[in-house]
């Protein structure tokens, strides 16, 4: 009976378990299904010893009067029926201490007993070979134990009521499958990792819900392809990123039932020649349906071309707009991945040149947009970009339409030709400058692709001293927005990308804006403007990086981790410009007010020091006597000023005084270690990647590191173990090295100096990282969070006061209305009472006899006398 009951419980547990389906990997699915047959949670071992052995032992009636020492105890009757044999100690007829029991059906137990129950450490073996070794609590496997199946499968971990519950590790005996993580009621539930092969190259780490992948997780396949994101019902579902290392592809976006569906970004990485550099990679950003590009989307080609429009099943279909690598644009209908009206686009180039102005005017009128928004060249060459008459070739097409419109029509052709020659003479140097600045802060790229952003371009402008021509970077942004039709919200965006041809166009436009008055009476004017800019600004100063952001590679990688939050703070405290186009800008005055609101202006960071930091790289801020706080700051200047503040101030005191403020949301840990910065700000550890907090790190939109091209993982992870070492550990590791040849170097004065300087550099970097963390996380970000909370509270109070005022007004109006009703009722009541009073009053006698003449006065007196005399007589 016992054996049958145990087997029934065990079979019921097997039937309740459903093997995990791994639809994304057939070979792993076979292994997991096979393993799931072994991953049965043994049913709770409930030996039949429990109830009978708890009963009080009987006494023979014949020995009722015997002494207590002579009392005889008998083993419970039911125990004799269940236990075939027992070897061990007994106390009062109950099993006690260590013993060995053989049950009906062949099950055995060897271990500790207490009051007749299996209690403590023991080993229970079923007749079919299943074995449990571990803790027992009153006949039930509890706490920690090890299950071993006949085929060699094992489980070691926490056990509750005989089932796997808590943290434990399972290994399959027939397949190289293992799981380590959390369990609930015998099923994988919570955080856990499963490995599908012996080499550990195929695995899943993340969330489980009763044997089903659900939540956040990372799946690495045997091929090396890896997915990181959300799961639902064992399939990729939600936001996630898939990297196909076998085909050099990557998709980041929305998934449905294991397939790309929704908005996402698909990137194709190209194999590049070593030490080469390219500006772009093939990339699609838009809508997906069942894994196909379908709907609205943009495709960026590695050559520099770009298509934006409608897609149907991976093909261009419907209305779209394609920009070729030379800058030419076609906008119209597409069919079956080709232009629908190809012949209409093949217009003669010379004919289009003669009618450039007419075509441009008609196209602008047809679209009904402004000149700045539709300034793209409308004169098309052959659609493959051939037959270029530009001296720069078909790969680069300068956009000079608006600049040439500033000159007489008869001199435009000469101006264009001369400036193209000037660019051609400097194209090698300009390419080198573009590559240099676009690679700033970029540690690694899979395909040597570096793309300049506005942040890099601002650094180039400041290094070349463009702002010394009495024009700020914010003014330059506005000038470029007029020539290039940049949307208002992106005029000062640091993440806007800049291609090489756009970079050249920007230089020509700024050269004209800065020097056109000087050469307006000379020809070719545009050529002279550009030549002077190259000679005075670019050639002498380019690639000599200044400032606090890009001056050192390692520090740049650390600093980039705070750029997203700083951009959020920057935009929050910008105000609309007073002049068109009324975009949001940051003035020095607003910056200082912001720091004052954050309680960061103190003895360490005074207003004078603030002004001097800003004036380091700008000659128009401070002239020794007066300061210009109306100067506009772009985000680069804002962020570099913050980096400088983190270096020039004593942040221990600042943080200590700041934390004394009654802020509930300020972090309690004042000093961030290097390891804290590495773990929290730079990359996720495997365990952190599978936590719920990891969802904060993942976003369907690109982070600032992706936008700017910074990939800090490789170098920072290499430097992480170095930063964690102390000086003593370094010395110990050096002593462990082989003494052959190297011992002399370490013992030499030169070697000691080298190692000492190396340690000093590590300590210096460590201190800088700590200061950076304290300043940004513990001070700046906490102050911003508190300030935003105050603003929300003030707004909430204002809304509540408005609601209360409105309610009070409504109540007053209702009260006034009731009072008016009462007044009206009172007036009507008084009128009604007056009417009743008039009706009830009797008529007066004089009013009834108005015509009766009054009697003579004498008669009246006599009558009164005569009436009074009888009265007197009666009284007497």
Swiss-Prot record:
The keyword Cytoplasm applies. The keyword Lipid metabolism does not apply. It holds the Pfam family MORN. Residues 1-16, 57-66, 373-386 have a biased composition (Basic and acidic residues). Keywords: Cell projection, Cilium, Coiled coil, Cytoplasm, Cytoskeleton, Flagellum, Repeat. GO terms for cellular component: 9+2 motile cilium; axoneme; cilium; sperm flagellum. SUPFAM superfamilies: Histone H3 K4-specific methyltransferase SET7/9 N-terminal domain (SSF82185). Residues 1-72, 360-386, 841-876 are annotated as: Disordered. It is found in: Cytoplasm, Cytoskeleton, Cilium axoneme; Cell projection, Cilium; Cell projection, Cilium, Flagellum. InterPro entries: MORN. MORN repeats lie at residues 86-108, 109-131, 132-154, 155-177, 179-201, 204-226, 227-249, 251-273, 284-306, 307-329. Residues 752-841 form a coiled coil. Interacts with RSPH6A. Does not appear to be part of the axonemal radial spoke complexes 1 or 2. May function as part of the axonemal radial spoke complex 3 (RS3). Radial spoke complexes are important for ciliary motility. This is Radial spoke head 10 homolog B. It comes from Rattus norvegicus (Rat). The lineage of its organism: Eukaryota, Metazoa, Chordata, Craniata, Vertebrata.
């Amino acid at each position: 009976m016992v054996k049958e009951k145990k087997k029934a419980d065990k079979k019921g547990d097997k039937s309740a378990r459903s093997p995990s389906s791994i639809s994304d990997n057939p070979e792993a699915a076979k292994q997991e299904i096979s393993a799931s047959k072994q991953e049965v949670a043994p049913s709770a071992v409930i030996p039949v010893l429990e109830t009978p052995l708890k009963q009080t032992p009987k006494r023979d009636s014949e020995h009722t009067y015997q002494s207590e020492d002579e009392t005889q105890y008998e083993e419970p009757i039911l125990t004799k029926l269940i236990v075939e044999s027992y070897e061990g100690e007994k106390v009062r007829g109950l099993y006690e201490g260590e013993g060995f029991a053989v049950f009906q059906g062949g099950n055995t137990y060897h271990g500790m007993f207490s009051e007749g129950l299996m209690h403590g450490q023991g080993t229970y073996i079923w007749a079919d070979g299943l074995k449990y070794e571990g803790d027992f609590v009153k006949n039930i496997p509890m706490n920690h134990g090890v299950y071993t199946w006949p085929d060699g499968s094992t489980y070691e971990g926490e056990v509750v009521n005989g089932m796997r519950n808590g943290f434990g590790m399972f290994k399959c005996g027939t397949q190289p499958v293992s799981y380590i993580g959390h369990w609930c009621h015998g099923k994988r539930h919570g955080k856990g990792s499963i490995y599908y092969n012996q080499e550990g190259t195929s695995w899943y780490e993340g969330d489980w819900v009763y044997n089903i992948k659900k939540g956040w997780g990372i799946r690495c396949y045997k091929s090396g392809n890896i997915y990181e994101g959300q799961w639902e019902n064992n399939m990729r579902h939600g936001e996630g990123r898939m990297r196909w290392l076998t085909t050099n592809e990557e998709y980041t976006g929305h998934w449905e039932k294991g397939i790309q569906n929704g908005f996402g970004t698909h990137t194709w990485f190209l194999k590049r020649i070593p030490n080469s550099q390219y500006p772009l990679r093939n990339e699609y950003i838009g809508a997906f349906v069942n894994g196909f590009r379908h709907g609205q989307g943009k495709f960026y080609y590695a050559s520099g071309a770009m298509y934006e429009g409608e897609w149907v099943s991976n093909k261009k279909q419907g209305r779209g707009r394609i920009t070729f690598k030379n800058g030419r644009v076609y906008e119209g209908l597409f069919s079956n991945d080709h232009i629908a009206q190809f012949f209409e686009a093949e217009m003669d180039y010379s004919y289009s040149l003669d009618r450039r102005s007419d075509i441009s005017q008609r196209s602008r009128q047809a679209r009904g947009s402004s000149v700045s928004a539709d300034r793209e060249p409308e004169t098309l060459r052959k659609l493959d970009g051939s037959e270029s008459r530009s001296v720069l070739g078909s790969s680069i097409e300068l956009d000079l339409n608006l600049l040439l419109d500033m000159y007489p029509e008869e001199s435009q052709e000469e101006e264009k030709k001369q400036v193209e020659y000037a660019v051609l003479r400097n194209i090698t140097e300009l390419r080198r400058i573009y590559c240099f600045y676009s690679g700033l802060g970029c540690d690694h790229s899979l395909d040597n692709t570096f793309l300049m952003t506005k942040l890099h371009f601002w650094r180039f402008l400041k290094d070349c001293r463009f702002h010394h021509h009495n024009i700020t970077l914010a003014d330059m942004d506005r000038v470029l927005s007029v020539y290039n039709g940049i949307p208002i919200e992106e005029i000062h965006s640091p993440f806007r990308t800049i291609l090489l041809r756009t970079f050249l166009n920007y230089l020509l436009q700024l050269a004209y804006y800065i020097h056109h008055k000087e050469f307006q009476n000379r020809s070719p004017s545009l050529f002279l403007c550009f030549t002077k800019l190259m000679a005075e600004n670019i050639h002498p100063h380019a690639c000599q990086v200044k400032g606090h952001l890009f001056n050192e590679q390692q520090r740049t990688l650390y600093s980039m981790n705070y750029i997203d939050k700083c951009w959020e703070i920057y935009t929050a405290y910008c105000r609309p410009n007073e002049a068109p186009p009324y975009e949001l800008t940051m003035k020095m005055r607003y910056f200082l007010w912001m720091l004052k609101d954050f309680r960061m202006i103190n003895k360490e960071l005074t207003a004078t020091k603030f002004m001097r930091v800003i004036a380091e790289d700008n000659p128009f801020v401070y002239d020794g006597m007066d300061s210009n706080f109306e100067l506009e700051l772009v985000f680069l200047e804002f962020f570099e000023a913050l980096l400088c503040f983190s270096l020039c101030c004593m942040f221990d005191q600042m943080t200590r005084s700041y934390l004394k403020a009654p802020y509930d949301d300020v972090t309690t840990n004042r000093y961030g270690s290097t390891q804290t910065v590495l773990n929290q700000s730079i990359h996720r550890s495997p365990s952190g990647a599978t936590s719920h907090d990891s969802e904060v790190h993942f976003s369907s939109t690109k982070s600032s590191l992706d936008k700017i091209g910074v990939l800090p993982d490789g170098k920072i992870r290499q430097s992480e173990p170095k930063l964690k070492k102390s000086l003593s550990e370094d010395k110990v590791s050096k002593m462990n090295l082989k003494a052959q040849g190297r011992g002399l170097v370490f013992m030499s004065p030169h070697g000691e100096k080298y190692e000492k300087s190396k340690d000093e550099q590590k300590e210096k970097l460590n201190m800088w990282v700590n200061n950076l963390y304290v300043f940004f996380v513990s001070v700046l970000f906490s102050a911003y969070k508190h300030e935003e909370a105050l603003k929300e509270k003030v707004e909430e109070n204002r809304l509540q006061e408005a609601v209360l005022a409105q309610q009070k007004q409504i109540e007053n109006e209702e009260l006034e209305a009731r009072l008016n009703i009462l007044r009206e009722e009172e007036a009507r009541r008084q009128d009604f009472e007056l009417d009743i009073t008039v009706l009830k009053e009797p008529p007066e006698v004089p009013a009834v006899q108005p015509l009766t003449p009054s009697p003579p006065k004498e008669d009246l007196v006599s009558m009164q006398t005569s009436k009074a005399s009888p009265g007197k007589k009666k009284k007497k």
